[in-house]
């Protein structure tokens, strides 16, 4: 399925064969047996933990150059007894997809190691992520992310997404914490734990995973209970990320209603309301498939209760206010996203998934083809410095079988405390 000669956009706009992509990609990607992690890697420290397990920073040994992030999957645990009952569906998906995917804007897997019934995924190390970058620009004095940097980040993100979609892969969990950035300014789409092949699925995608995409980045068709969805769900998330890069805060910051004991998926009323407040009420005249959505009656109830029946889109007003508050020029220039930025944002945040812009179309949008040229290094021209990812020596034993089941926050950097650390609460 993942052809070795697939052509794709590179990060400066051309096409070239897939194999010529990135000579830095470690060779021998795949499963390695009877090899101990510490024989091949020096563990520098602990990065983060979640429901999946733990992530450590490491340096290669014996001629294996470079820095790596080692993801150790947690075995099932009951009390003090480790139960080796197999891997989660998320872990299996991530391993199988990352072993096949090969693109400069998708996280790069070096190898998979099995040691003492524990699975380790060894990735290239990335120093930053978009959540960390956004947080930095809110501290200590709020200052906007430079417009050329946003353009480069967004182009590289869409470039990687085009590759995934062309190879029939939906990411389904795009959010700032999952968009990684190397110290040289290369953007990588990370965390493919919810990714899914969508080429002629035997069952609807809904039947396998009823809840996908972190709530603030979840497309309206998912909120409306759609049983079948498309790559358009990822493009809506890109629109939300674009808006967040501009405003330094989530554009649709709703509260998630949790599933009940019967695992019934509730209507996300608060999140839908946050979208309606900016985008206006979706209408069947512009979204013909709306009336067939399982939660259509809930939407009507929300609109009547909140007085939103005649609410029109205020996205342009939000955009202009965002430009003004963050010091961007309202007209086209090197220092502003301009009207082209608004047009792209509005097409990414299109209610009807059939009308929503695709990754291919977005890459050809005037926002990218006019104005400031796109740089392969998103940090090019930026004189500031972003803090390094926090790596601690606490709990630094990668061999430890006792892995606490801490709540997965999606935060790859433990240094993001306070308000920013709460933003990705799921």
Swiss-Prot record:
Cofactor(s) needed by this chain:
Mg(2+)
Gene3D superfamilies in the record, alphabetically?
Phosphorylase Kinase, domain 1, Transferase(Phosphotransferase) domain 1
Amino-acid positions noted as binding ATP in the UniProt annotation, renumbered to this chain: 47-55, 71
Where is this gene product found? Nucleus
GO MF terms, alphabetically ordered:
ATP binding; cyclin-dependent protein serine/threonine kinase activity; metal ion binding; protein serine kinase activity; RNA polymerase II CTD heptapeptide repeat kinase activity
- All residue ranges annotated as the Protein kinase domain in the record: 41-368
EC number(s) given by UniProt:
2.7.11.22, 2.7.11.23
Give a short account of what the protein does: Component of the srb8-11 complex. The srb8-11 complex is a regulatory module of the Mediator complex which is itself involved in regulation of basal and activated RNA polymerase II-dependent transcription. The srb8-11 complex may be involved in the transcriptional repression of a subset of genes regulated by Mediator. It may inhibit the association of the Mediator complex with RNA polymerase II to form the holoenzyme complex. The srb8-11 complex phosphorylates the C-terminal domain (CTD) of the largest subunit of RNA polymerase II.
The principal location of this protein is: nucleus
- Active site residues per record: 173
By what name is this protein known? Serine/threonine-protein kinase ssn3
PANTHER family, alphabetized: CELL DIVISION PROTEIN KINASE, CYCLIN-DEPENDENT KINASE 8-RELATED
Give Gene Ontology CC terms: CKM complex; mediator complex
Family assignment from sequence similarity: Belongs to the protein kinase superfamily. CMGC Ser/Thr protein kinase family. CDC2/CDKX subfamily.
- Supply the gene name: ssn3
Organism encoding this protein: Aspergillus clavatus (strain ATCC 1007 / CBS 513.65 / DSM 816 / NCTC 3887 / NRRL 1 / QM 1276 / 107)
């Amino acid at each position: 399925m993942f052809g070795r000669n697939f052509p794709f956009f590179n990060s400066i706009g051309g096409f070239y064969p897939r194999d010529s992509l990135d000579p830095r990609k470690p060779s021998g990607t795949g499963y390695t047996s009877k090899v101990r992690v510490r024989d091949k890697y020096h563990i520098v420290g602990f990065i983060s933990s979640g429901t999946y397990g733990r992530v450590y920073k490491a340096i290669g040994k014996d001629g294996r150059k470079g820095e790596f992030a080692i993801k150790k999957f947690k075995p099932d645990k009951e009390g003090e007894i480790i139960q080796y009952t197999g891997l989660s569906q998320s872990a299996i998906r991530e391993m199988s997809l990352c072993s096949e995917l090969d693109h400069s804007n998708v996280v790069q897997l070096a190898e998979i190691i099995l040691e003492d019934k524990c699975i380790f995924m060894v990735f290239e190390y990335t120093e930053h992520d978009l959540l960390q970058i956004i947080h930095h620009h809110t501290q200590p004095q709020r200052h906007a992310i430079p417009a050329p940097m946003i353009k480069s980040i967004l182009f590289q993100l869409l470039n990687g997404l085009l590759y995934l979609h062309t190879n029939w892969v939906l990411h389904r969990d795009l959010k700032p914490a999952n968009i990684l950035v190397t110290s040289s300014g290369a953007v990588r789409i990370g965390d493919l734990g919810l990714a899914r092949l969508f080429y002629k699925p035997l069952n609807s995608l809904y039947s396998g995973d009823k809840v996908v995409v972190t709530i603030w980045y979840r497309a309206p068709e998912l909120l409306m209970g759609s049983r079948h969805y498309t790559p358009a769900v990822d493009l809506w998330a890109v629109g939300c990320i674009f808006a967040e890069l501009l405003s330094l805060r989530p554009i649709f910051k709703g509260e998630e209603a949790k599933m009940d004991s019967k695992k019934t998926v509730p209507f996300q009323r608060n999140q839908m309301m946050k979208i309606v407040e900016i985008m206006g009420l979706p209408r069947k005249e512009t979204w013909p498939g709306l009336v067939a959505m399982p939660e259509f009656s809930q939407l009507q109830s929300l609109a009547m209760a909140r007085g939103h029946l005649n609410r029109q889109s205020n996205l342009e007003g939000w955009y202009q206010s965002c430009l003004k508050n963050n010091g961007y020029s309202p007209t086209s220039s090197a220092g502003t996203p301009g009207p082209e930025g608004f047009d792209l944002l509005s097409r990414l945040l299109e209610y009807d998934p059939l009308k929503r812009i695709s990754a291919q179309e977005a890459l050809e949008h005037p926002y990218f083809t006019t104005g400031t040229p796109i740089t392969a290094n998103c940090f090019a021209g930026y004189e500031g410095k972003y803090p390094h990812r926090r790596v601690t020596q606490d709990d630094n034993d990668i061999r430890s079988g006792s892995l606490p089941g801490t709540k997965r926050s999606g935060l790859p950097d433990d240094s993001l405390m306070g308000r920013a650390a709460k933003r990705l609460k799921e």
